[in-house]
Amino acid sequence: MSDELKDNAAKEASFGAFLTRQLMKSVPAVTGNLDGKVAIVTGANVGLGLACARQLLSLQLSHLILAVRSLRKGEAAALELQASFPHARVEVWALEMESYASIQAFVSRCHSELGRVDIAILNAGLALKRFQTCTNPQTTPREITLQVNFLSTVFLALLLLPILGAKKEKKDAVFIPGRLTLVGSDTVYWVNARELKSRPLLQAANSSEGFDGFEQYKMSKLFVLMFVAKLARDLVSPDQVIVNVACPGLCKGTAFVREPDSNWAKQAIVSSLIRLVGRTPEQGARVYLAAAILQGPKSHGSMISEGDILP
């Protein structure tokens, strides 16, 4: 994890720091050449995922896998991308993040059809207002935000590590570490610490008692950050795969909130804040690319925002 994160958390958690990040810190444009490389983007048919896919292709990416829940929506996005970037191979693969079986099938297909993946950006996520459990019969009934944003995301990340660290077929090719970027959020600064101390973490996150959708979202992203820090420190060398977390900030035009807020006043405040200070999906997606392409081994296990390693 970023060395100074724990020491700067209080400062970064202030509303003033949030506004500074949103309004005064520019998100750098990413340049480079991804010719010959293969990338996966989950949740890639809308919002930040689609903007990320478009930017990867603009850097001459050769092969892009759009990993999506809805094949119909994914195919529509792929047609648009293919028309704009005819040089690339754009494929749509099914990935249901509520199902471990779907995740395993997706990774099995990666091994059989791709051999090597250079970049994986795990963008799929959601936020719910009410407590709901997964309905997939192949998945243990858990709260959906916890399942999709954390448990399924880290399961997918672990399964992708071997193919991200695979060597190129050419024996004389210089090995370049794979890149694995999980999408986080700077809302981790606002997690209720008392709740984390009251009982085991997963037990607290899987309880309907006093459920708060925004608190659940923040907690799920904190778990992702903790996982990446542990993974990078103890299990994965940056010489094989560079793993980090990208925080796009508050963005407009995203579709991760699956249901409207019944409190119209609260909804109006949130909508106004997004309209006034929210970044465009294109700006947010630049953070993904900065983490997955520009940042080197120093970012291993760290959180990236505005193109820089946080605090």
Swiss-Prot record:
Pathway: Secondary metabolite biosynthesis. The active site is at residues 217, 221. Its EC number is 1.1.1.-. Disruption phenotype: Does not affect the production of oxopyrrolidines A and B. One of its GO terms (molecular function) is oxidoreductase activity. NADP(+) binds at residues 48, 73, 96, 123, 217, 221. Keywords: NADP, Oxidoreductase. Gene3D superfamilies: NAD(P)-binding Rossmann-like Domain (3.40.50.720). Belongs to the short-chain dehydrogenases/reductases (SDR) family. Short chain dehydrogenase; part of the gene cluster that mediates the biosynthesis of oxopyrrolidines, polyketide-amino acid hybrid compounds with feature structures of tetramic acid. Does not seem to play a role in oxopyrrolidines A and B biosynthesis. May be involved in further modifications of these oxopyrrolidines. This is Short chain dehydrogenase opdN. It comes from Penicillium oxalicum (strain 114-2 / CGMCC 5302) (Penicillium decumbens). The gene is opdN.
